[in-house]
Regions:
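SDR active-site lid
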Residues: 141-205
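Substrate-binding pocket helix/loop in short-chain dehydrogenase/reductase
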Residues: 70-83
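Residue(s) in the substrate-gating loop at a strand-loop-helix junction
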Residues: 114
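Active-site helix of classical SDR
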Residues: 94, 129
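Rossmann-fold cofactor-recognition segment
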Residues: 24-39
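Conserved glycine-rich Rossmann-like NAD(P)H-binding loop of the short-chain dehydrogenase/reductase
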Residues: 3-17
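Conserved NAD(P)H cofactor-binding loop of Rossmann-fold oxidoreductase domains
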Residues: 62-67
Length: 210
C-alpha cells in the first residue's frame, strides 16, 4: 500500500475521478476537498483541514495560476489572483501544516515553483510570484534547519499537463526536447527529499536554462 491522500482542486468531478483511480490502482485512502485557493473562504477551509490532520507527512503546494498578459494592462484582476494562489495560499497552507510537523519533528513541504523564478522573461507577475515561492522555501528551510522538517522548492520547466492550455498559451511549436512528463518531474522531486537540497531543478535542459 502507499500513502493516503487528501486531494485539493477546484473541480469536484475531476477530483473524484482521480481519487477513484488512485484508490483502485494503489490501494490508498483518498479524500477529495474541492476548493478554489483564490477564494478566501475556500483557502481558509483547506487551512483548517490541514491543521486538523496532525498525521500529515507531506504537503505539496502545487496550485497554479497562469497568465500571459501585460501587468499594466491587467483589468481582470489576474495579478491579484496570481498573488493569492502562489503567495498567500502557499504561505497560509504551509503555516497550517507546520505546527503538527514541528511537534512530531518530521514532515516535508514541497512548493512547486518554476524555472520562471530565475527568469525575467516569463511574465511580470508569474516570474515574481514563483521567485517568492523559491525564496520562501529556501529561507524557511534555513529557519527549520534542526526541526526534522524538509522544505523543497521544485522548479520544473515545460511539463506535459493542462496548465499551458488553461492559461491560453499555445506552445505546440516548442520541440519535445524541452518538455518533461509530470511523472518524471515527480520522481525527481520525491527522490530529492532523501537529501537536504532545497532548490530542485529537474532535467538537464532546465538546469542549463537556470
Amino acid at each position: 500500500t502507499g500513502t493516503d491522500l487528501i486531494l485539493v482542486a477546484r473541480r469536484r468531478e475531476r477530483l473524484e475521478a482521480l481519487a477513484a483511480d488512485l484508490s483502485a490502482r494503489y490501494r490508498v485512502g483518498t479524500e477529495v476537498f474541492p476548493a478554489d485557493l483564490s477564494v478566501d473562504e475556500d483557502l481558509n477551509s483547506v487551512a483548517r483541514k490541514i491543521a486538523q490532520t496532525p498525521e500529515l507527512d507531506l504537503l505539496i503546494n502545487n496550485a497554479g495560476f497562469g497568465g500571459h498578459g501585460q501587468f499594466h494592462l491587467d483589468e481582470k484582476g489576474e495579478a491579484d489572483q496570481m498573488i493569492k494562489v502562489h503567495v498567500v495560499a502557499t504561505t497560509i497552507l504551509t503555516r497550517a501544516a507546520l505546527r503538527a510537523m514541528m511537534a512530531r519533528r518530521q514532515g516535508a513541504i514541497i512548493n512547486v515553483a518554476s524555472v520562471a523564478a530565475f527568469s525575467p522573461l516569463s511574465g511580470t507577475m508569474y516570474s515574481s510570484t514563483k521567485a517568492f515561492e523559491l525564496m520562501f522555501s529556501e529561507n524557511l528551510q534555513t529557519e527549520l534547519y534542526d526541526s526534522g522538517i524538509k522544505v523543497q522548492a521544485l522548479c520544473p520547466g515545460l511539463t506535459h499537463t493542462e496548465f499551458h492550455e488553461r492559461a491560453g498559451l499555445n506552445l505546440s511549436a516548442v520541440p519535445e526536447i524541452f518538455w518533461m512528463s509530470a511523472e518524471e518531474v515527480v520522481r525527481i522531486s520525491l527522490r530529492a527529499l532523501r537529501g537536504y537540497k532545497v532548490i530542485i531543478v529537474p532535467g538537464n535542459i532546465n538546469k542549463i536554462m537556470t
